[in-house]
């Protein structure tokens, strides 16, 4: 993938907190409700799992990814919060896409709060993004086309260079 990877823990923590705030308190409220109703050993076992967080900056957009068991995931709440939805539509879309969550786990946020994340893989993330017609989606599509064009140009340039080498030999 072309873009910038951000590994700085402070930037990741700030981004994660601000993305959770975009979700109108839903992430924190759901986490608190779930935490009250389950055995705390479930939370502790999830927190002991190794989950790496990374930000991927692609064009003007930032994505927070969670790396677990050799796979990349993102929080469904974060993706839907980028779609300019009203609170009612946000909740409706969450209910629609919850069955596609690949993984749910407790992850410690930078401010010390345990958050119950509903994680989706990159394929599901792309499917969700492309199913909307928001400013974010239009920007995402334009940036994908731009990067594909750059890759195409680089491949054609390599073919041209190889043809020159072949002619000279």
UniProtKB/Swiss-Prot annotation:
Residues carrying a glycan: 13, 29, 39, 48, 135
Membrane disposition: Single-pass membrane protein
Lineage: Viruses, Varidnaviria, Bamfordvirae, Nucleocytoviricota, Megaviricetes
Transmembrane parts of this sequence: 145-165
Cell compartments where the protein resides: Membrane
Residue ranges of the motif Cell attachment site: 109-111
A GO CC term assigned to this protein in UniProt: membrane
Record-given protein name: Uncharacterized protein L536
Keyword Transport: no
Highest rank taxon of the organism: Viruses
Keywords associated with the record: Glycoprotein, Membrane, Transmembrane, Transmembrane helix
